[in-house]
Swiss-Prot record:
SUPFAM superfamilies: Translational machinery components (SSF53137). PROSITE patterns: RIBOSOMAL_S11 (PS00054). PANTHER family: 40S RIBOSOMAL PROTEIN S14/30S RIBOSOMAL PROTEIN S11. InterPro entries: Ribosomal_uS11, Ribosomal_uS11_bac-type, Ribosomal_uS11_CS, Ribosomal_uS11_sf. Part of the 30S ribosomal subunit. Interacts with proteins S7 and S18. Binds to IF-3. Gene3D superfamilies: Ribosomal protein S11 (3.30.420.80). The lineage of its organism: Bacteria, Pseudomonadati, Pseudomonadota, Alphaproteobacteria, Rhodobacterales. Located on the platform of the 30S subunit, it bridges several disparate RNA helices of the 16S rRNA. Forms part of the Shine-Dalgarno cleft in the 70S ribosome. One of its GO terms (molecular function) is structural constituent of ribosome. Belongs to the universal ribosomal protein uS11 family. Keywords: Ribonucleoprotein, Ribosomal protein, RNA-binding, rRNA-binding. This is Small ribosomal subunit protein uS11. GO terms for biological process: translation. GO terms for cellular component: ribonucleoprotein complex; ribosome.
Length: 129
């Protein structure tokens, strides 16, 4: 019983003029998702997928590399203008935004969508080094 060879369908090239860049920057990693205006994903990348491991994932340079990777994939689909939604307290927020602008995207607006707890869960205790 030989298995039939299945072909994986290549992602077809979409022609989308504008999109939304969701930059999620935590203390440990930075993830960038570029979607169309409806929220359907076009491209994504993170510091971990760029080959950074451990504490190097949380650096601004790793966030910059991830943003450039996601941005280039989105440009292949025809994205030219971006709205940027930044979320989280991490160090990669600013550098990811600068990297997207440096690639050649026209950034129309920047929103901070970090959720703020109204006395929710107790935060982790401070580190004593």
């Amino acid at each position: 019983m030989a298995r039939d060879k299945t072909r994986t369908k290549r992602k077809e090239r979409k022609n989308i003029a504008s999109g939304v860049a969701h930059v999620n920057s935590s203390f440990n990693n930075t993830k960038i998702l570029i979607s169309d205006v409806q929220g359907n994903a076009i491209s994504w990348s993170s510091a971990g997928t760029m080959g950074f491991k451990g504490s190097r994932k949380s650096t601004p340079y790793a966030a910059q590399m991830a943003a450039e990777d996601a941005g280039r994939k989105a440009q292949d689909h025809g994205v030219k203008t971006l709205e940027v939604e930044v979320q989280g307290p991490g160090s990669g927020r600013e550098s990811a935004l600068r990297a997207l602008a440096a690639i050649g995207f026209n950034i129309t607006n920047i929103r901070d969508v970090t959720p703020i707890a109204h006395n929710g869960c107790r935060p982790p205790k401070r580190r004593r080094v």
